[in-house]
Design a protein with these regions (language model features):
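Short, exposed beta-strand "edge-strand" segments with a Pro/Gly-rich flavor and a Y/T-containing core
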Residues: 36, 106-107
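Alpha-helical transmembrane segments in multi-pass integral membrane proteins
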Residues: 29-38, 64-65, 69, 74
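Non-cytosolic membrane-interface motifs at loop->transmembrane helix junctions
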Residues: 2-13, 39, 71-79
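Juxtamembrane membrane-water interface segments that cap and precede transmembrane helices
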Residues: 70-75, 149-153
Protein backbone atom coordinates (compact mmCIF):
# COMPACT_ATOMS: atom_id res chain seq x y z
CA UNK A 1 0.00 0.00 0.00
CA UNK A 2 1.11 3.52 -0.81
CA UNK A 3 0.63 4.71 2.79
CA UNK A 4 3.22 2.24 4.08
CA UNK A 5 5.66 3.33 1.38
CA UNK A 6 5.32 6.94 2.49
CA UNK A 7 5.80 5.98 6.15
CA UNK A 8 8.85 3.89 5.22
CA UNK A 9 10.25 6.73 3.13
CA UNK A 10 9.87 9.23 5.96
CA UNK A 11 11.38 6.78 8.45
CA UNK A 12 14.41 6.28 6.18
CA UNK A 13 15.03 10.00 5.93
CA UNK A 14 14.35 10.77 9.58
CA UNK A 15 16.55 7.93 10.87
CA UNK A 16 19.61 9.43 9.20
CA UNK A 17 19.14 12.99 10.44
CA UNK A 18 20.07 12.63 14.14
CA UNK A 19 23.25 10.63 13.56
CA UNK A 20 24.50 12.69 10.63
CA UNK A 21 23.36 16.02 12.05
CA UNK A 22 24.94 15.55 15.46
CA UNK A 23 28.18 14.18 14.01
CA UNK A 24 28.63 16.85 11.36
CA UNK A 25 27.63 19.65 13.74
CA UNK A 26 30.03 18.37 16.42
CA UNK A 27 32.94 18.13 13.99
CA UNK A 28 32.40 21.60 12.57
CA UNK A 29 32.00 23.13 16.03
CA UNK A 30 35.23 21.42 17.12
CA UNK A 31 37.09 22.86 14.12
CA UNK A 32 35.43 26.24 13.57
CA UNK A 33 37.47 29.17 14.87
CA UNK A 34 39.91 26.99 16.74
CA UNK A 35 43.62 27.31 16.46
CA UNK A 36 43.91 23.59 15.97
CA UNK A 37 47.25 22.39 14.68
CA UNK A 38 46.39 20.23 11.68
CA UNK A 39 48.27 16.97 12.00
CA UNK A 40 47.95 13.92 9.79
CA UNK A 41 45.66 12.36 12.39
CA UNK A 42 43.32 15.37 12.41
CA UNK A 43 43.24 15.51 8.62
CA UNK A 44 42.45 11.79 8.33
CA UNK A 45 39.65 12.03 10.88
CA UNK A 46 38.17 15.16 9.30
CA UNK A 47 38.22 13.72 5.78
CA UNK A 48 36.95 10.42 7.20
CA UNK A 49 33.86 12.20 8.55
CA UNK A 50 33.36 13.77 5.11
CA UNK A 51 33.61 10.31 3.49
CA UNK A 52 31.17 8.90 6.00
CA UNK A 53 28.69 11.72 5.29
CA UNK A 54 29.04 11.38 1.50
CA UNK A 55 28.41 7.63 1.79
CA UNK A 56 25.38 8.41 3.93
CA UNK A 57 24.03 10.83 1.36
CA UNK A 58 24.44 8.13 -1.28
CA UNK A 59 22.43 5.79 0.94
CA UNK A 60 19.68 8.37 1.45
CA UNK A 61 19.48 8.96 -2.31
CA UNK A 62 19.22 5.19 -2.84
CA UNK A 63 16.59 4.94 -0.09
CA UNK A 64 14.25 7.24 -2.00
CA UNK A 65 11.66 4.88 -3.45
CA UNK A 66 11.66 6.46 -6.91
CA UNK A 67 15.48 6.25 -7.02
CA UNK A 68 15.71 2.84 -5.39
CA UNK A 69 13.75 1.22 -8.20
CA UNK A 70 16.37 2.52 -10.65
CA UNK A 71 19.57 2.43 -8.56
CA UNK A 72 19.36 -0.49 -6.15
CA UNK A 73 20.70 -3.25 -8.38
CA UNK A 74 23.32 -1.00 -9.94
CA UNK A 75 26.86 -0.04 -8.99
CA UNK A 76 25.38 2.79 -6.90
CA UNK A 77 24.96 0.47 -3.90
CA UNK A 78 28.61 -0.64 -3.72
CA UNK A 79 29.55 3.01 -4.35
CA UNK A 80 27.93 4.35 -1.22
CA UNK A 81 28.89 1.29 0.83
CA UNK A 82 32.54 1.58 -0.22
CA UNK A 83 32.43 5.31 0.50
CA UNK A 84 31.57 4.58 4.14
CA UNK A 85 34.40 2.11 4.36
CA UNK A 86 37.16 3.34 2.06
CA UNK A 87 36.86 7.05 2.78
CA UNK A 88 35.38 6.76 6.28
CA UNK A 89 36.35 3.71 8.31
CA UNK A 90 39.74 3.17 6.68
CA UNK A 91 40.75 6.81 7.19
CA UNK A 92 39.56 6.67 10.81
CA UNK A 93 41.62 3.51 11.36
CA UNK A 94 44.77 4.86 9.73
CA UNK A 95 44.36 8.10 11.71
CA UNK A 96 44.02 6.21 14.98
CA UNK A 97 46.95 3.88 14.37
CA UNK A 98 49.12 6.77 13.21
CA UNK A 99 48.23 8.72 16.37
CA UNK A 100 48.89 5.62 18.48
CA UNK A 101 52.28 5.06 16.84
CA UNK A 102 53.50 8.58 17.65
CA UNK A 103 52.38 8.41 21.28
CA UNK A 104 55.24 6.06 22.15
CA UNK A 105 58.04 7.42 20.01
CA UNK A 106 60.04 10.57 20.47
CA UNK A 107 60.06 11.35 16.76
CA UNK A 108 56.67 12.89 16.00
CA UNK A 109 57.88 14.32 12.70
CA UNK A 110 55.94 12.84 9.77
CA UNK A 111 57.70 10.56 7.32
CA UNK A 112 59.29 12.06 4.23
CA UNK A 113 56.52 11.26 1.78
CA UNK A 114 53.49 11.61 4.06
CA UNK A 115 51.85 14.36 1.97
CA UNK A 116 52.35 12.35 -1.22
CA UNK A 117 50.98 9.22 0.45
CA UNK A 118 47.96 11.14 1.73
CA UNK A 119 47.37 12.54 -1.77
CA UNK A 120 47.62 9.02 -3.23
CA UNK A 121 45.14 7.75 -0.65
CA UNK A 122 42.61 10.49 -1.38
CA UNK A 123 42.99 10.54 -5.17
CA UNK A 124 43.01 6.74 -5.39
CA UNK A 125 39.99 6.42 -3.11
CA UNK A 126 38.02 9.17 -4.85
CA UNK A 127 38.75 7.78 -8.33
CA UNK A 128 37.82 4.26 -7.25
CA UNK A 129 34.52 5.46 -5.79
CA UNK A 130 33.76 7.77 -8.70
CA UNK A 131 33.92 4.79 -11.07
CA UNK A 132 31.25 3.08 -8.93
CA UNK A 133 29.05 6.19 -8.72
CA UNK A 134 29.26 6.86 -12.47
CA UNK A 135 28.44 3.23 -13.18
CA UNK A 136 25.44 3.38 -10.86
CA UNK A 137 24.23 6.63 -12.37
CA UNK A 138 24.54 4.97 -15.80
CA UNK A 139 22.41 2.02 -14.53
CA UNK A 140 25.22 -0.52 -14.84
CA UNK A 141 24.19 -3.63 -12.87
CA UNK A 142 26.39 -4.69 -9.99
CA UNK A 143 26.13 -8.44 -10.54
CA UNK A 144 27.58 -9.03 -14.01
CA UNK A 145 30.92 -10.73 -14.54
CA UNK A 146 30.92 -9.73 -18.21
CA UNK A 147 28.84 -6.84 -19.43
CA UNK A 148 26.35 -7.22 -22.28
CA UNK A 149 26.90 -4.95 -25.29
CA UNK A 150 24.25 -2.46 -24.18
CA UNK A 151 26.14 -1.97 -20.91
CA UNK A 152 29.59 -1.68 -22.45
CA UNK A 153 30.39 1.42 -20.35
CA UNK A 154 30.88 -0.93 -17.39
CA UNK A 155 34.15 -2.47 -18.58
CA UNK A 156 36.14 0.79 -18.97
CA UNK A 157 34.79 2.05 -15.64
CA UNK A 158 35.92 -1.20 -14.01
CA UNK A 159 39.44 -0.73 -15.41
CA UNK A 160 39.56 2.90 -14.26
CA UNK A 161 38.26 1.88 -10.83
CA UNK A 162 40.90 -0.85 -10.59
CA UNK A 163 43.70 1.60 -11.41
CA UNK A 164 42.54 4.04 -8.73
CA UNK A 165 42.00 1.18 -6.25
CA UNK A 166 45.61 0.10 -6.83
CA UNK A 167 46.84 3.63 -6.04
CA UNK A 168 44.63 3.63 -2.92
CA UNK A 169 45.94 0.25 -1.75
CA UNK A 170 49.58 1.25 -2.32
CA UNK A 171 48.99 4.31 -0.12
CA UNK A 172 47.45 2.12 2.60
CA UNK A 173 50.45 -0.21 2.46
CA UNK A 174 52.84 2.75 2.77
CA UNK A 175 50.94 4.03 5.82
CA UNK A 176 50.91 0.51 7.28
CA UNK A 177 54.65 0.16 6.74
CA UNK A 178 55.42 3.54 8.35
CA UNK A 179 53.12 2.93 11.31
CA UNK A 180 54.57 -0.56 11.83
CA UNK A 181 58.10 0.83 11.65
CA UNK A 182 57.28 3.36 14.40
CA UNK A 183 55.66 0.72 16.59
CA UNK A 184 58.56 -1.71 16.17
CA UNK A 185 60.99 0.98 17.38
CA UNK A 186 59.23 0.91 20.75
CA UNK A 187 59.93 -2.79 21.19
Amino acid sequence: PEGFQIIGQLASYLASLPAAGVTVFSVFIAVYRTKMKWSLTNILFFIGVAGWVIGGLGAVIDATISNNIVLHNTLWVPAHFHTYNAMGNVLFSIGFFYWFSIQFTENVKPEKFTKLTLAMLLIGGAGFLLAFYLGGADSIPRRYSTYPAELSAGAPLAVIGAIFATIYLIAILIFFFNISKRCLKVL
